[in-house]
A protein has these predicted regions:
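Nucleotide/phosphate-binding catalytic cleft detector across ATP-hydrolyzing
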Residues: 1-21, 26-112
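Glycine-rich phosphate-binding loop of actin/hexokinase-like ATP-binding domains
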Residues: 39-55, 97-178
Length: 179
């Protein structure tokens, strides 16, 4: 609610006149915001509790709806707070929001969406078919568990080019010789 409070302070608006809030985030962040258990996201079956409940027929969507009061938001107490649906596992509501923003389900042409962060989501599709995948990317940025190589720091190779003569040229962060 801190960012929302800051945004409200930046605009001349009475927070009690805010009646709708939309919340998106990766599966874990969205579920934490709505005080859902995230236990099942971090281990097998790697799915939100809302996905599991939907598969069991206990709900018809992975969307969540609460009130401003229950979410402790500085808005009208009866404001509807929507959590957009999770697509699957680690492809969360933020990815669903991207798909809505570009109108992917209405497009004839192929559309690609990349959300690069701790988990990277890749979505490719159009109105005929949509494919989505997620993979952990944090270790690649942080240098975690790298057996050969290094984090993205000075001395790390950031670009490899092959010219017409068959010679490789390396781009190195910070210039100089790669470590």
């Amino acid at each position: 609610a801190g960012y929302l409070t800051h945004a409200i302070e930046e605009f001349p608006v009475d927070p009690k006149t805010i009646y709708e809030v939309v919340v998106v985030g990766n599966s874990t962040m969205r579920d934490l915001f709505f005080r859902q258990s995230v236990y099942t996201i971090g281990q097998n079956p790697y799915r939100s509790i809302t996905e599991i409940e939907m598969a069991e027929g206990k709900r018809t969507t992975t969307s969540l709806i609460e009130t401003g009061r229950r979410c402790l938001l500085p808005v009208h107490p009866d404001a509807r707070v929507y959590g957009l649906p999770i697509i699957s596992g680690h492809v969360g509501a933020d990815a669903a929001a991207c798909m809505l923003a570009v109108g992917m389900a209405d497009e004839e042409r192929l559309v690609a969406i990349m959300d690069i962060g701790t988990n990277t989501e890749l979505i490719l599709g159009n109105k005929h078919r949509i494919l989505a995948a997620s993979c952990p990317a944090g270790p690649a940025f942080e240098g975690g568990a790298i057996a050969c190589g290094m984090p993205g720091l000075d001395g790390a190779v950031e670009d490899v080019m092959l010219d017409e003569s068959g010679t490789f040229t390396l781009g190195v962060i910070g210039g100089g010789i790669p470590e």
